[in-house]
Amino acid sequence: MKISTNESSTTAYAPIHPDYQFINPATLREEDEICFIRAQNCCVCYVDIVDSTITTSSINNPEKVRKYYEIFLNTMAAIARNFGAKIIKNVGDCLIFCYPRTSDPSNKSAFNDVLECCITMIDARNTINQKMHEEELPSLSYRISADYGRVEVARSATSESDDLFGPIMNMCSKINSKAPTNGIAIGDGLYKILQSFSSFSSLEDNCYHFEEIITPEG
C-alpha cells in the first residue's frame, strides 16, 4: 500500500494473511463461457417501448415499475409464442425473439406468421394500455423491427438458453428506432422475401403503408 501526500510519499506494507493463497494464472483451467452451436438463417424481431426511461422515472413505487414492464413483456411474449416464435431474451424493456420455421425461405406460412404476429402486437396496444390503466399506470407506445438473415446460435456455459449473434441482430436493433411509433420497420432481407408473397401484396393494397427507410452506414 502506498500513501501519497503533496509534501511527501510514504510506503507502508500490510501483513499478508496466513490463509491467503497466491493464484498462478498459468495453472487456471481455460473454459469457454460462450459456445457457438450452429449458424442458420431466420427472421428476428425486436419490440421496444418508446421513452420508457422517462416514463418509469416518474413512477415512484418500485412495484408499479415492475408491473409496467411485466404487463408489456409478458403480453408481447405470449403473442410471439402464439405465432411460433422463440423468445431469445429481453434487454431492459426490449423483447428479442426469432422464428425458427423461417429457416426455410420458401415456407410462406412461416413468414405469414411473422407478419401476423407483428400486426397483432401493434393491435394489442389498446388492450395493454387498458391493463396499465387498471393498475393506475401510464399508457405506453412501442416500436417493432424485423429482419431476415444469417445468425450464429450460441449458448453460455452458465445457461441452457440460446442466444443469437451476427450482423442481422445489429441491423434489427438499429432500424427499430426508425420505425414509426406503434409501427413496424422491416429490414431489406425480410422485405425481399415478403415481396414475393401474395399476403404481403394484399397488405400494401389495404390499410398498411410501406415506405423505404434509408439508414446510414456504420
How would you name each of these model-derived features?
Residues 68-72, 117, 121, 171:
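Hydrophobic alpha-helical membrane-association signature
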Residues 147, 167-192:
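Catalytic/regulatory signature loops of cyclic-dinucleotide turnover enzymes
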Residues 54, 153, 193:
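Conserved protein kinase catalytic core
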